């Protein structure tokens, strides 16, 4: 038999699990009718407990199917809440219990349904359990017989046991006494023996002195013989050591000779190589027809080859030491040469820097009058092109944006400091040369370097008016203090080339 629960409330499942434990029946819970119907059809031995909330959700077809299965088995219990007593979906269930209910109430209902004896299994029984226990105990006591006889037998047993215990104790005491007596007797015997030994010793002393003299002479003879034997024994090892000394000298000489031979002779690896060569030569010689002649002729070159190999290897060993020394000395020379070259390069670099500075100064002095002539030639061009001025002036939004040279030309004035400013423009790493300037700057900064081809291209595309404007903007952006800091320890070289105009231009 198994309890099958059709329920979706977890509290009810816990309550019925506790009831199933008391009934010692397994329980299975199903939330959906399809699973429940499949389980009910598998086995007919079950007790169905259904909840009205799940029964309300069933279709007409499912409810009719469930009603048929319940009617066949006749082991079904329905739980319902207040107000659902007369609902049609509760029809067919044999037992109905109202919610909420206690587990004991459900237990009683299930016990009645299962046909078990409620009086035996319920916790609140009519009979007192102590009465049942007493009845059973009296029945057992009647079978045991007279208690008085047992009570009389127990003291008799005790009296019988007591004398046996006393006898055992007495026996143990007697044994201990006997052991003590034996020990005392042994001690007395030992003492008597000691006394007898003490008495015997003076009697031995009273013996005649002749025995003592004889014993003394024998002792002396023994000592003399021992003394004689000792020097003989000492002489023997001395002779042995003397014999060993020349042997040691010979061994040392042999070792020295071996060392010399080993130094002169080739190493083990070399000997192996020589042996391999000898074997190869012997194999080659054995293959010939005349073995005896070839052996004699082969031995001579073999000896020669061995001697040559030995001499070559000894020479190689001797040469290895100076080679190592020469390698070390060569490495040291290379290092010193590298240091010297570095020093020379360091010393040459400032000279290279100083030479262009002096050349730049000379070129600068020559170029200043050229600039003046170029500027003089530029002024009539500016006068001849009043349209360009007007277009440029039209582009300026305010008077402040008009550069000073344009204003000066418009007013008919010349700027005398312009030539000086052109000569004193510093060379910075961030200054980018305009492609229309024919200026080559050589300074200590290595990043701004131009090839002569680039110079020629820049010369071809140069225009004097834009040159003046760029210089003027640069001078505006720099203050006097920044000019001073930039111009310190720096030189500027400007190269201007005059070329004939091409006929196409």
From Swiss-Prot:
This is Chemotaxis regulatory protein ChePep. Keywords: Cytoplasm. Interacts with CheZ; the interaction is essential for each other polar localization. The keyword Cytoplasm applies. The gene is chePep. Plays an essential role in chemotaxis. Regulates flagellar rotation through the formation of a complex with chemotaxis protein CheZ. Plays a major role in colonization of the stomach. InterPro entries: Chtaxis_ChePep. NCBIfam families: Chtaxis_ChePep. Residues 172-263, 289-311, 337-346, 359-373, 386-398 have a biased composition (Basic and acidic residues). GO terms for cellular component: cytoplasm. Disruption phenotype: Deletion mutants cannot control the rotation of their flagella and swim with abnormally frequent reversals. The keyword Cytoplasm applies. Residues 154-403, 420-465 are annotated as: Disordered. Residues 440-451 have a biased composition (Low complexity). It is found in: Cytoplasm. Signal peptide: none annotated. Its main location: cytoplasm.
